[in-house]
Amino acid sequence: MTDALTAFGLTAADSGHFADVLAAASSNANTNVSMMGETFKYCAPVAGALGFSVEDTAEAIGLMGNAGIKASQAGTSMRSIMTNLTGDVKLSGAAIGDATIATTNADGSMRSLSAILADCRVAFGGMTEAEKANNAEALVGKNAMSGFLALMNAAPEDIAKVSGDRKSVV
């Protein structure tokens, strides 16, 4: 856990909050704290470097867990997804045309992971299954494609459930 804390720029004093976030997310998703810790081992350095919050990262991990993508598989997928979200996200489809999703704020800082993924979900909602697969592969690669599609296909109720309780611990 201390490695993940350090990666997010947190201190030992934040360990209680970090544990609360993991516990809340895991209790609302098909995963557990141990598997979430394994996932964080792989993706926390990238998440922290990009300025993504522990809360948003835990939400994404929980949503992947609901799709059966857990532990190291989720960690490597999350790491790849986050790495590929460092520039503008370019998507295309017959119904949406060419779309660009900004990943940075006007000051150059990264937008929140939840906001970026929410915008991607809107774009993916207007695509055929084939377009979703093609865009996911082009954006994050074949190895992370299943994890990314799990995030894109998450039901609004699942997103609310996974994020709901963890926001109360912030």
Which stretches of residues belong to each language-model region?
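Alpha-helical architecture feature
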Residues: 1-26, 35-43, 53-170
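Short coil/turn linkers that connect adjacent helices within long alpha-helical scaffolds
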Residues: 29-30, 47-50
